[in-house]
A protein has these predicted regions:
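Structural signature for solvent-exposed beta-strand/loop edge elements and short helix-capping sites
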Residues: 1-174
Length: 174
């Protein structure tokens, strides 16, 4: 598994955990979603301002095009593309996760907004909201799997993505 960021000028496509096959002889790269904890994390495209879920990306490095596709075992599956400014109340409520006594997106976004920083540590959330470290860690891993934050489990460093803040602001304005 590898985190991959494909640059195109100032823009990029990013995924936190994919399997990479590079064919140097033919200048081709195949990215496949790993089966680990980030299997549900979307790819992020800064050029289009979207997140998208797909099983594989295939890139012939001699061209400027990337093939994006999804397949299930039985048939083709859709590639889901979602604007970072999209808000759906039902989807947002599902991001509350199961087993949390708080809404993880609201918790991290509110902390980021109130402290005017998107980067902080898990311990900051534990202290501010008086939550158990294990509960905060589970919530942060959940949000990282959904592509809403970057989370370094070893250091506890959190970077809240603009999408998470947008979701919380949209929810509070509803």
């Amino acid at each position: 598994d590898a985190a991959v960021k494909i640059f195109h000028g100032k823009d990029s496509i990013f995924h936190p955990s994919v399997d990479v096959v590079f064919d140097a002889a033919n200048s081709r790269m195949l990215l496949s979603k790993s089966k680990g904890k980030f299997k549900d994390a979307p790819y992020a495209s800064t050029y289009f301002g979207v997140d998208f879920s797909a099983e594989r990306l295939r890139w012939d490095l001699k061209t400027d095009s990337i093939d994006i596709y999804s397949e299930s075992a039985a048939a083709q599956a859709p590639v889901v593309i979602e604007s970072r400014t999209h808000f759906n109340l039902s989807d947002f409520l599902l991001l509350g996760g199961a087993g949390f006594s708080f809404h993880p997106v609201v918790l991290v976004s509110t902390y980021a907004i109130e402290n005017r920083t998107n980067t902080f540590y898990a311990d900051d959330l534990v202290k501010k909201y008086k939550r158990k470290p294990g509960e905060i860690q589970m919530a942060l891993e959940f949000l990282a799997q959904k592509g809403l934050i970057d989370y370094d489990i070893k250091t506890g460093k959190v970077n809240v993505k603009e999408r998470a803040i947008h979701l919380t602001k949209s929810f509070k304005n509803k």
